[in-house]
């Protein structure tokens, strides 16, 4: 298990910091359980941009749309990423957009499916090591978006430290023993969970030689419809130093979303063209 950057910059300013010592694993388990149970109230709709920033090539920006909710306590997400926008040819004929459609669920009952708008046939199930492959030419993989490592059963609580000026809990997550394909490529994942907001502010993915492969981190937290969300999420390839930024351009929170939005049939049509019945979650206040 490699030392964390935070451990090398360990702050002794707070008597509550335990990183580098022998933190209570039972306490760590309670912290992790609480984090896993957290989620936004209701569903959400985000208009997003993927800014692909390779070190030695031109930056490319892709637009997309993301819907999310929770099924039986597990996050489920439907995403469209427009890889090539609609256009017209020299004769004035419409050239349809090329869109990558994604549907995935994390935690209990996890699965992932994809469908390209320009390819005929049913959606494809993504499993095994295929979840580690980049999507839409970016540094993001389904593995990063699904974050299955949050739910891996075997972990070590590394302790609490001050990271980016805030109290933060660090966990080392071990890949499941039964997932042999994954274990060939991933040696472990380190989580940085902010104690104040109870959100994952940074993730580090390591290979089997404990070499840092990628770092995922969020920038900025804002409130939308009364709920805290991140503004941007960056993923950096620590081998090539290429980077991709996921930016939330516009957000609506606390939505009531139809179940069929998160079914495989939804992948047969772009989100922009679907008639999605969106409502607002009802909130009741106790009157004394």
Language-model segments: which ranges?
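N-terminal mature ectodomain segment of secretory-pathway/periplasmic proteins
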Residues: 12-119
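Short, surface-exposed beta-strand/loop "edge" segments at domain boundaries and coil↔beta transitions
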Residues: 54-59, 85-95, 117-126, 178-184, ...
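Gly/Pro-enriched, hydrophobic low-complexity segments
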Residues: 133-146, 157-265
């Amino acid at each position: 298990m490699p030392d964390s950057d935070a451990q090398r910059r360990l702050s002794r300013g707070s008597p509550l910091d335990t990183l580098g010592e022998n933190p209570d694993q039972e306490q760590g388990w309670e912290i992790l359980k609480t984090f896993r149970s957290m989620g936004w109230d209701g569903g959400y709709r985000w208009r997003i941009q993927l800014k692909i920033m390779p070190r030695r090539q031109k930056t490319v920006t892709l637009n997309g749309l993301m819907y999310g909710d929770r099924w039986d306590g597990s996050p489920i997400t439907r995403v469209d990423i427009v890889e090539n926008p609609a256009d017209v040819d020299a004769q004035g004929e419409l050239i349809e957009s090329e869109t990558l459609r994604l549907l995935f669920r994390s935690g209990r009952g996890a699965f992932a499916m994809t469908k390209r708008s320009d390819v005929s046939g049913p959606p494809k199930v993504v499993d095994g090591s295929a979840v580690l492959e980049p999507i839409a030419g970016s540094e993001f993989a389904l593995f990063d978006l699904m974050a299955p490592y949050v739910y891996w059963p075997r972990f070590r609580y590394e302790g609490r430290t001050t990271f980016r000026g805030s109290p933060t809990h660090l966990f080392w997550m071990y890949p499941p023993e039964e997932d042999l394909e994954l274990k060939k490529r991933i040696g472990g994942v380190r989580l940085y969970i902010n104690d104040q907001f109870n959100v994952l502010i940074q993730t580090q993915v390591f290979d089997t030689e404990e070499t840092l492969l990628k770092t995922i981190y969020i920038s900025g937290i804002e409130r939308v419809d009364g709920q805290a969300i991140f503004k941007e999420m960056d993923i950096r390839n620590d081998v090539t130093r290429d980077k991709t930024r996921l930016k939330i351009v516009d957000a609506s929170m606390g939505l009531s979303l139809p179940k069929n939005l998160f079914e495989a049939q939804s992948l047969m049509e772009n989100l922009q063209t679907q008639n999605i019945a969106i409502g607002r979650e009802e909130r009741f206040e106790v009157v004394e």
